[in-house]
């Protein structure tokens, strides 16, 4: 079913994203299908792949232990997300005439050990081709 889902996209996705439980099950399936590969990125980090597509564990929300991609407790299902990151697929955008990252530094000429500054990021995403991203819902993991 995963190959059928990936085949419905307009190209090879840049990543397969989900929660830890789903990624673990996909990893096991990929091993059985001889599609599991482990490579190292430019920084020496181990990257697990389904063929040439890296698995991405979305982990938990900052400051909590809640999964970014949750599991429905009643049905025991979750969702799988894929995206082809490219200028003609899914990519980041910033507002016209505004720098994506704005920085306000504190006044270092005043006395005091504690200074206050700000950093603001203005960004959004654009999906240029509807088949460049997809979600596979209701995958049983429990």
Predicted regions mapped to residue ranges:
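Sequence/fold signature of self-assembling virion shell proteins
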Residues: 3, 11, 24-142
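Extended amphipathic alpha-helical segments with heptad-repeat/coiled-coil character used for oligomerization
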Residues: 10, 14-16
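Structural motif
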Residues: 18-21
